Each structure stands twice: as C-alpha cells, then as structure tokens.
Amino acid sequence: METSAMLSIFKETQALLDGHFKLTSGRHSDSYFQCAKVLQHPEHLGTICSAIADHFRESGVDTVISPAIGGIVVGTEVGRQLGVKTIFAERKDGRMTIRRGFSLEKNERVLVVEDVITTGGSVAEVMALVEAAGAEVAGVGCVVDRSNGTVRLADSQFSVISLEVHSWPAESCPLCRNGVPIEAPGSRAASPSPSA
C-alpha cells in the first residue's frame, strides 16, 4: 500500500493529529501519530502488520519483541503473521526489562517491532536487552518512522510510513514560545512543559 493511502487511513481514523504535543521522547511536535486509533480496527491492523511481516518473512525470525505499551499490539500481530512467539519488554523503575516469565535464548533471531519511532530510544533499549541475552537482532520494524529514515537502529530496518515530522527540544519549541497549549498523549506519563 502506498504511503498516501496509508496516511489517508490514519487521517480517516483520527490517528494523525495536528496541534502541540509532548512526545514520549520528551521532544515537542506539531503532529502526533496515535497508532492505537488506527490499530483498533482489525482490518487496518492486519494490513499494516502484513507489510512489516512480509518484509521480514525470509529473515529467519524466531521471536518478535516489542516495547510496551504501543508496540505490543503491532508486535503480536506481526508475530502471528510470521508464525513465531511474541513477547514484550516493559519499564520497571524507569528501565526497560524483560519480565512476566518471558525470556530469550542464546542465538535466537529476534525482530524488534514498535508502533512509532521518533528518536529510537525505546527500540535501542529493547535491542540492548536482546543482545544482553545473547540473542541476535534480526531487524527493526515499525508502523511510523517520524525521522524519515534518519534514525538507523539496525542494518535491516523497515517502516510502513516514513515521514519527516517537525519536532523540537522542549527548550526551543516555537509552539511553547507562542503559548500554544500542549498535550501529552503518549503511553509514558509526561509532565507539562515549564514553558507551556
């Protein structure tokens, strides 16, 4: 499916928002991809995840891992389509961990799947967990790459939508300077910006 058609689906389901947002990364932006709004529709979830699964189908993936919360639905569906187990990593005391009885085996080929990549911080943390377990990162897949490909996390990396979306460090955000009210819709609790 072409990027323009995929963006139409995001707009139609109100998953692409315009305004002033504090992103999970801490940066500010004038747009926000709320992937949950599009992924709540099974037909869109299947279409989006099939693009990721198809890209990695011949990569010998044994397991799909996703950072909680946003990546779980996407990772689970990609894993289902690839016919492999799916697990997730989550934050405990501010650090990404593998819990709930999940584990990775030495030399296991692991695909890291996320909903949205802005700076790649959460994905990089999950990749470090995979490598610390002695497993191998088979690639990184995501629904939306907000960096338009400038954030490279793995040799094999794929995004369904790749766009350059404006974002700024909080201290130099033009929307804050103009007094535009800010929202923090991400999955991690975000505190209001002092300049908001």
Curated annotation (Swiss-Prot):
Keywords: Glycosyltransferase, Magnesium, Pyrimidine biosynthesis, Transferase. It catalyses: orotidine 5'-phosphate + diphosphate = orotate + 5-phospho-alpha-D-ribose 1-diphosphate. One of its GO terms (biological process) is pyrimidine nucleobase biosynthetic process. The keyword Magnesium applies. Pfam families: Pribosyltran. One of its GO terms (molecular function) is magnesium ion binding. It is an enzyme of class 2 (transferase). 5-phospho-alpha-D-ribose 1-diphosphate binds at residues 114-122. The keyword Glycosyltransferase applies. PROSITE patterns: PUR_PYR_PR_TRANSFER. Its EC number is 2.4.2.10. Pathway: Pyrimidine metabolism; UMP biosynthesis via de novo pathway; UMP from orotate: step 1/2. Its cofactor is Mg(2+). Orotate binds at residues 118, 146. PANTHER family: OROTATE PHOSPHORIBOSYLTRANSFERASE, URIDINE 5'-MONOPHOSPHATE SYNTHASE. Homodimer. Catalyzes the transfer of a ribosyl phosphate group from 5-phosphoribose 1-diphosphate to orotate, leading to the formation of orotidine monophosphate (OMP). Belongs to the purine/pyrimidine phosphoribosyltransferase family. PyrE subfamily. NCBIfam families: pyrE_Therm (TIGR01367). This is Orotate phosphoribosyltransferase.
